[in-house]
Amino acid sequence: MAAVALLRGAAVGRRSPAWHWRLSGTASHCLARGFGLLGSNPADGVAWTCFRLDGRALVRVRGPDAAPFLLGLSTNELPLSGPPTGAAQPSARAAYAHFLNVQGRTLYDVILYGLPECTEGAPSFLLECDSSVLGALQKHLSMYKIRRKVTVEPSPELHVWAVLPCVPQTSETAPLEERVEGTTMLIRDPRTARMGWRLLTQDDGPALVPRGQLGDLQDYHKYRYQQGIPEGVCDLPPGMALPLESNLVFMNGVSFTKGCYIGQELTARTHHTGVIRKRLFPVKLEGPLPASGVSPGAIVTVTATGQAAGKFRAGQGHVGLALLRSETIKGPLHIKTSESQLVAVTAVVPDWWPTAAK
């Protein structure tokens, strides 16, 4: 039944803008589940681990036409921009989305941030992207700018941090509150509560987070893979990955009620047919690995039949992501490495995915 349910695109609603500023006990517990690799002894006083993501970069898009311009290119609604109002919570200032090519395949995965600054009524947004495609994303945006009153420019002065809890929160844990002030933004990750918070700042991340410590970037990527979160061009190869196979719906990254955008036709048609035969699954690798790791694109094989189940996409150590046919995920799988070694593969369905996908 689980495999059958995974064939259908489970709909996930966008989060309500009426999120609470302070983490609730339930959300805190959800954030910390599965964080064994980030665990810290509570006695040492550390509550949060901060990871500086030098592999992520920021592009600023501003101007009177910034909002309609971005709406016509991205898969999702835009986050709020402009000065805070009593009706809007800072949580609504971040949104996850993909930019697609005309064939409907993913070019860039981005987190959009609506900035509080607003000059003469002109909104301003920051787009977080893989740093290796910073120039390509700017070129992509400029290509569609035409005569719109929009300025596209990098923001190298700001750094992106991921902030994750070390252990489940208790009444003694220092809670985080969302901040949108000056050059600092501390916002809940819009993809899933499991990914904690995003921090944009010119300053040192741990210094801004109560009881924060600097984390090892490899731990961040291992945890991200365990949760099934693709991020960047290694996980989402430009022009190859399909947004719904990449679980864009599960990560709150697409709106099926917004206006038209580049690449919409294939995404909308797939959604309305309700059948997604392949998905990007988190996988565990068992057995000795080659010194260079498993190669991206390595064929994942159904052990019992020898048929191809899909392809390994990317990973860190013994965890990673693989694009697999949903009906094959329960059976024993393996990868034959370039050194002719067999590596056992176990596909995992994350427990934060919608019930219909389990």
Swiss-Prot record:
It is found in: Mitochondrion. Keywords: Acetylation, Heme biosynthesis, Mitochondrion, Transit peptide. One of its GO terms (biological process) is heme biosynthetic process. The modification N6-acetyllysine is found at K222, K311. Signal peptide: none annotated. InterPro entries: TrmE/GcvT_dom1, YgfZ/GcvT, YgfZ/GcvT_CS. Pfam families: Beta-barrel_CAF17_C (PF25455). Residues 1-94 form a transit peptide. The modification N6-succinyllysine is found at K311. One of its GO terms (molecular function) is transferase activity. Belongs to the GcvT family. CAF17/IBA57 subfamily. This is Iron-sulfur cluster assembly factor IBA57, mitochondrial. It comes from Mus musculus (Mouse). The lineage of its organism: Eukaryota, Metazoa, Chordata, Craniata, Vertebrata.
